[in-house]
Design a protein with these regions (language model features):
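Active-site histidine-anchored catalytic micro-motif
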Residues: 1-171
Length: 171
């Protein structure tokens, strides 16, 4: 059987936004009745990523978990925030014109680093469902990350489960 649903998360317009979606994913797996299979957590947004990581417990000065802040800091060195024209080739004049024709503010196009980071990390996580539970390891969590700092938005997280379900009266 295959089950699919979506959850919505709200992103900040000024900074990278992390959302712990573990509880929602576990709930959807539980409600599906899948005993053994896989779950895929996916973003169709090209400036977002889905990762598995442990909870750091400690908080940074920014209010993020320390591992989350470390990830942001590492990627700021690899793909710096778009702070000046010419830092990246994208967006070019055609991309800006396309955005304008589709009702987008040109400033929202200056999110090249978010596209690059999403491409490097990826936009999905696949985990095993074993005996009805998601195998994330002892300390694993699933995070949805919006790398786009140009505008706040409602983002969609897709959760797809596939596997063998318990049948009435046995397996």
């Amino acid at each position: 059987m295959i089950f699919k649903n979506k959850i919505k998360v709200e992103s900040d317009h000024k900074e990278v936004t992390f959302h712990n979606v573990t509880a929602a994913v576990k709930e959807t797996v539980k409600n599906s009745g899948i005993k053994d299979g896989i779950v895929v957590v996916y973003s169709h947004h090209t400036t977002c990523s889905v990762i598995t990581q442990e909870c750091a417990f400690d908080m940074s000065m920014t209010g993020r978990e320390t591992l989350q802040q470390d990830l942001v800091d590492v990627f700021e060195k690899i793909c710096p925030s778009y702070t000046r024209e010419g830092l990246y080739l994208h967006p070019g004049p055609k991309a800006l014109k396309f955005a304008e024709e589709h009702g987008e503010d040109a400033r929202g196009c200056h999110n090249t680093e978010a596209h690059l980071i999403s491409s490097i990390i990826g936009r999905n996580v696949t985990a095993v469902i074993d005996e009805g539970e998601i195998d994330l390891g002892e300390f694993g969590f699933i995070y949805f990350i919006d790398w786009d700092k140009t505008r706040g938005r409602t983002r969609t997280v897709q959760i797809i489960r596939q596997g063998a379900c318990k049948k009435a009266g046995g397996w």
